[in-house]
Every structure is written in structure tokens, then in C-alpha cells.
Amino acid sequence: MPPIRGLYFFRSSSRLRAVRALGLDVGSKTIGIALTDEAGIAAHPLTVLERAGNSGDATTIAAMVAQNGVTDVVVGMPYELSGKVGHRGRQVQQFIKVLAAAIAPLEIHEQDERFTTAEAERVLIEADVSRAKRKAVIDQQAAALILQTWLDAYRKRTESR
């Protein structure tokens, strides 16, 4: 489906809607954050948030959601290699519950994040980013990969309807 007036529209149920999504790579110390462009086609690294507890983080992210006109939030789920939800995954699920209350009625989508940090590191190395700079931006780059993966799959599902 072609862009219309700078926005990419996705079919949702029986209606079309524009998508502006925020992607999160939730870690124990930081949260990498990415945002789609206004057309809803490409994900871009945005920032890294130092963790301030689930409630504080949810409040900060809710403000970003409002400020950027976000319609969907995508959270990377750290599944184990077996596909099961482990300790880290349960921590992320707890965060999702707190975030969901802060951004209601927006929907939160979970996206498998296995290997995204390794892929983000590979991308940054190929771009000849220094080790010190990589450390500062790896989480937001991983968030962008998580978000782009979800966006591509969502577009494909939507266009095939």
C-alpha cells in the first residue's frame, strides 16, 4: 500500500490507521528506545533511558508516547533459546503490566528480541563505530532492530488481508 500524505496506513480490522510506533529494549540498567519515522516505515534509534524503576520508567515512556503521537508500543521479549519465558522475560512482563496502565488504551506488542543486541553490535562494527560509542548506543540500536522487525511483520500481515 503506498504512502498517503506522508503516513503509511495499515489495515486494522475493517479500517485503515496510521502507525507511529515506539520500540523498547528493556534491560536491567537501561531501556533502549527507538521510534518509527512519521511515515511508519522505518525504525530509528532515539535514546537510552537509565532505569528508574518500573513506575518511573513507565511515566517517562508515557510522556514520550504523548509527545511523539505514538499509536503502538513494541517491547522486545527476551525469550530463552528454547522459546520459553525465563527470569528476564518475567521481569519484562512485569514492566509491561506497569507500562500498559500508564499508556492505556494503547496496545503493547511483544516482539522476540533474541540476538538483537548481537545484531546491533554487528551493524555498529560494520559502520566503524568506536567501542566507546557502541557501548553508548547499543541499546537504542537494538530497540530499532526490534521495532523494525515488528514493523515489517505487521506491514506484511496487514497487506495480506
Locate each region found by the language model.
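Phosphate- and other anionic-substrate recognition elements at nucleic-acid/protein interfaces
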Residues: 2-22, 28-161
